[in-house]
Amino acid sequence: MHPRFAKPLDTLSAPLKAALLPMLGDDFQARFTPDQVATLKAATGLDDRALRLALLPLAAACSVAPISKFFVGAIACGLSGNWYFGANMEFAGQGLFHSVHAEQSAISNAWLGGETGISEITVNYTPCGHCRQFMNELSTAKILKVSLPDDLSALQSFLPHSFGPADLDITDALMSPQAHDELTLVSDDPLWQAALAAARQSYAPYSQGYAAVALQFADGRIFCGRYAENAAFNPSLPPMQMACAHAVLGGEDLATIRRAVLLESKDGQISQQDSARATLKALGSVELEYQAV
C-alpha cells in the first residue's frame, strides 16, 4: 500500500478500513471495479453516494498541492460502473495555469481507463468555474450529477446559460470514442507506440492538434496523457499535465521520470511542445523527446 493512504485510512470506520485494505496494494490504480464497490457496500451498509463521500479522503490523499496546500479529491463514476479517483496537482515554481484540478484528474483517469462517459462526480469542495466548464464538454454533460458532502445537483444547475461545443457547431464531445488513425509512426519503441495510441484517442475538435505524452519511470512503467480540448479553450487539459496526474494517481514519483515523449499532429493549428517542455523542466533534468507526424 502507498504510504499516502495510511493516515486517511485511520479516519475511516473499522468495517470500511478492513474491506479496503486488500484493494489498496501496490498495484492499486486509483479505481474500483463494480465487484469491489459491491464488496465495500456489503461491508459497510452504505449506499453508492455515501460510500463515495466516505472514500473522498483517500482520493484527496493523492493530491500534490505545494502552492495552495489545498487538497481536493474527486471520484468519477464511469458508465461501466467503475469508480475513478482524482486529485488536484500543482507544479512548484510554475505558473498556476499548469495545475490540474481534481475533477479533471478523475475524469482523465476514467477516460484513460476506457470510459466513454461518466454519470456522477463526487468532490469534497464545490467545483470552480474552470471545472464546470471542463465538465460541460463531456459526452454526458446534460445528465451528469455533481455530488457534494451536502448536496446532489445536476451539472447544468451549476452552469445556467452554458457555453459548450454546440455553440461552435461541434457535435463531438470529450470521452466520445476517437480514432485519429491518420497519425502514423514507424517505430518499435514501446514508449513511442504508447504515445501514438494515446494521440489517436485524443480530443481536439477546435484546433485539430491531436497530441499525447508518454512518460516512462525508473520502475519501467509507462503512463500516458491525451490532449483534452475545450470549447472555452482555456480549460483545455494538456497531455503532459494529464500524464503527470495519471502517474501520480498510479503511485509514481514524478522525480523518477526517465523518459518523456510528445507526439502530435503536424497538421494541427497549435503545438504542445513548448508547454510540455516547461512542465517537464519543473520536474527534473529529463529532456523531452518530440515528433510531429
UniProtKB/Swiss-Prot annotation:
Residues 47-166, 186-293 form the CMP/dCMP-type deaminase domain. GO terms for cellular component: cytosol. Its cofactor is Zn(2+). The active site is at E103. It holds the Pfam family dCMP_cyt_deam_1. GO terms for molecular function: cytidine deaminase activity; identical protein binding; zinc ion binding. GO terms for biological process: cytidine deamination. Substrate binds at N88, M89, E90. PANTHER family: CYTIDINE DEAMINASE. This enzyme scavenges exogenous and endogenous cytidine and 2'-deoxycytidine for UMP synthesis. This is Cytidine deaminase. It comes from Aeromonas hydrophila subsp. hydrophila (strain ATCC 7966 / DSM 30187 / BCRC 13018 / CCUG 14551 / JCM 1027 / KCTC 2358 / NCIMB 9240 / NCTC 8049).
